[in-house]
Amino acid sequence: MGFTEKQEALVNSSWELFKQNPSYSVLFYTIILKKAPAAKGMFSFLKDSAEVVDSPKLQAHAEKVFGMVHDSAIQLRASGEVVLGDVTLGAIHIQKGVIDPHFVVVKEALLDTIKEASGEKWSEELSTAWEIAYEGLASAIKKAMN
């Protein structure tokens, strides 16, 4: 079974909730660094600070990550596959030293952040929709890394 219309709608509505509050971007990176402190150096906007500090670069990067997962949901619904809009993503991830466990950390942080943003609208169905969309994106990035 492919990505359903309902799953796409769930991702769309929670994406809108995420975008409404910039503090979710800080939460996202705080969770990443709690789970994988060594990842701090991978992000130019985090490596020189003692803790996660809000900044335009942090906001832009978080919105890009969540936006790409959102776009992946749309692509999965439309065609059943994710095609990267930015062909340099594979090379960037190689350059930063990203390995498989990092994708797991980001997925967990993304799901925790969406859970927080969704509040009472959170459900297993919503979590599954984001997880499938993220896995589609992660798979496309890993493919571009090879």
Curated annotation (Swiss-Prot):
Modified residues (Nitrated tyrosine): 24, 29, 134
Positions annotated to bind heme b: 44, 64, 93, 96
Residues where Phosphoserine is found: 44
Record bears the keyword Secreted: no
Record-level GO cellular component terms: cytosol; nucleus
SUPFAM superfamilies per record: Globin-like
One Gene Ontology molecular-function label: heme binding
Cited Pfam families: Globin (PF00042)
GO biological process, one term: nodulation
Family as reported in the entry's similarity comment: Belongs to the plant globin family.
Induction text: Strongly reduced levels in boron-deficient nodules. Inhibited by abscisic acid (ABA) in parallel with lower nitrogen fixation in nodules.
Subcellular location: Cytoplasm, Cytosol; Nucleus
Entry-linked Gene3D superfamilies: Globins (1.10.490.10)
Binding site for O2: 61
Self-association and partners: Monomer.
Post-translational modifications reported in the UniProt record: Nitrated in effective nodules and particularly in hypoxic conditions; this mechanism may play a protective role in the symbiosis by buffering toxic peroxynitrite NO(2)(-). Nitration level decrease during nodule senescence.
InterPro entries per record: Globin (IPR000971), Globin-like_sf (IPR009050), Globin/Proto (IPR012292), Leghaemoglobin-like (IPR001032), Leghaemoglobin_Fe_BS (IPR019824)
Keywords of the record: Cytoplasm, Heme, Iron, Metal-binding, Nitration, Nitrogen fixation, Nodulation, Nucleus, Oxygen transport, Phosphoprotein, Transport
The UniProt record lists the keyword Zinc-finger: no
Main function: Leghemoglobin that reversibly binds oxygen O(2) through a pentacoordinated heme iron. In root nodules, facilitates the diffusion of oxygen to the bacteroids while preventing the bacterial nitrogenase from being inactivated by buffering dioxygen, nitric oxide and carbon monoxide, and promoting the formation of reactive oxygen species (ROS, e.g. H(2)O(2)). This role is essential for symbiotic nitrogen fixation (SNF).
Tissue note: Root nodules.
Protein name: Leghemoglobin Lb120-8
Domain Globin stretches: 2-146
